Each structure stands twice: as structure tokens, then as C-alpha cells.
Amino acid sequence: MRKIIHIDMDAFYASVEQHDHPELRGLPIAVGGAESRGVVCAASYEARRFGVRSAMPGAKARKLCPQLIFVPVNFDRYREVSRAIHAIFHDYTDIIEPISLDEAFLDVTENKVGEPMAVEIAREIRRRIREELGLTASAGVSYNKFLAKIASDARKPDGLCTIHPSQALDFIAELPVEAFWGVGRATAERMHLLGIRTGADLRERSLEQLTRHFGKAGRVFYDFARGVDERPVIYEWVRKSLGCERTFGENSAEPLVVEAHLREVVEELDGRLQRRQFSGRTLTLRVKFADFSVLSRSASFSEAFSSPELLLQRGLELLRGLDYADRPIRLLGLSLSHPPEELRPGMWVQQWLPFAEDEE
């Protein structure tokens, strides 16, 4: 049986700022969003108590929390700390799947320290992050990625939770459907209309019922409700492309808000590219709208690139080529593919992918 750990840093950007600036500790702070039409990148737990959230317009955040302190974004610093965190991970395993600068899965089934108990590795990683970096992390331990993620969410912030195989079905049964991967606001509403509100309700539905109502995602929900998730922890270095996505807190068709989200995606993607030392010639933008339709646009270039400046410039060009004024966006994704050795000469001409429908 596999042993999977999910590590999720607590309010990462805001916590780094509070660590580096002791005068901010214990105060409600927002990273980014100070400009008149800016958007909050991250909020400290003190600010979250007032309802301040990431991707929220700064003006709204200030109304919710008049004493909110805005600090500028410092992605170079966040990447530096993220690299230090990953260096700690690598002391225990090289089977690491980064999700973002502040989140990762680790497969410690076979590990470098010969520790049979995954929970002890998770406990040691959390201790080292606290002592060496002055930050806190939440960790979930289980036998697959779905349950490890659920476990880390259950004890945030600064917690450790283990879900053993014998506990999995009871744990899942009590989960609200909103806690399941792939269940956003609209899907949750559809589930509620069908009388599905918890993992137990979901488990009562047949595979045929779930796929009829939710398409391909129905199979995933069926498996998750039974504690089944066979997805491996994916090494970054075996991938032919690297990308990341961000789901909005609120759907938006406001260009400033959408482009602020794209900048955040670029920053996360840049961190992954740097760790992998990966470059590519094809950039793909993926947009999911409020009605769950999906549109992809791709452009290929003669030279491989990976700089955040070019990622942002070319990503914005793809985004600004779309007409979404009447189509609020709920998710943006950006990926870089075709490393230098994989794209044949002469394939540099810009290419556009057609509109495509997709399941949530």
C-alpha cells in the first residue's frame, strides 16, 4: 500500500511577509491589491477572519476589513522560500509532485531515511519547516492523493491528520460534497438538487447515475466516494509539459481581475519551470467559463523560452485575443510544452486550437 503525504503551507505568501516583517505578525494583511483596482493575491489568517480572500478586489477587502494592511507582492522571495521547502522534501524522497509554490504531494512508500511510518516523516518535515524557516505547514497522510489532500485540509492551519484505510469510508461519509476535488459551486448545486450533500450520499449513487449527471467526472466522484484514487505522484522531470491552473474565488469578466489571475498563474508556473529547468516552444492558455465550457488557445515559437516576462507577455496576448466580455471566467490555466528536442524545425508557425467542450 502506498504512503502519500500532502503538504500545504499555511497562508504562504502572507506568512512569509509576517516572518520577514515581525511588525506585521498578528495583524490582518493582504499581499497585493493596494492599487485602486488591484486584486488580493493572499490574505493572512487574521484578515481571513473578516472574510478577506485571495483573488478578491482590494477595494472590497478594505471594506470588509478597514484596518487591513496591504503589502507588495515579492514573488522572488516566495520562490526562494519554496526552494528551501523543497530541499527539505528531497531529504526524504525524490518522488515529489509540486502543485504550486506552497503545496506538494510526496510519495514516501520507499524513502531515503528508511522510516516505515509516513506520519513520522510528515511530523519531521513540519518540524523542520517551522525551525529552519519560521513557517507553519499543514500535512495530510494517507494511502492515496485524494485522501492525503482531504486530511491536510481537515487540520488547517498548522495541523497533521492521518486517514488510515480502516477510517477512510467513515471519514469520507461525513464530508460535504464541496470538499471533494472537482466539485465547485455549480457542481455542488447540481448535486444538492439530486439530494447529494455528503460523501455518504455520493456513495449511494450508482456509477451509471453519476456519469449520466456529471459525465467523465462522475467516474471520479464514484471512486473518491469509495476511497479509491489510483493517480500516482508525478515526478516533474518525466513530464513533457509543465503547467498550472487557478480557479477564481468568484467568476469574473473584468479584464483587470482576469489578468491579475493570469499573473498569479505565471508566477506559479515560473517557479515550476525554474525547479525543473524546463523550457518549451508552445504556450497554451486554457479558459473555463462560468457555464463550464472550455476554450484553449495555443501559440508556438521558433525558440524555446521560460522567462516569466515572456510567459506573461505571450499569455496576455492569448488572453486578450479572446472575447469574454459577456462570458465570466471561472478558471485560467497556462502550460508550456514542446521542449527544444521535441519540436522539429519548421513547426514554429503560430497555431490556434479550436473551441472545445469539457466536463468540470
Model-predicted regions and their roles:
Residues 1-213, 219, 336, 340-344, ...:
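Gly/Gly-Pro- and Ser/Thr-rich, intrinsically disordered tail segments characteristic of DNA damage-repair
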Residues 6, 179, 187-331, 338-359:
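DNA-contacting surface of Y-family translesion DNA polymerases
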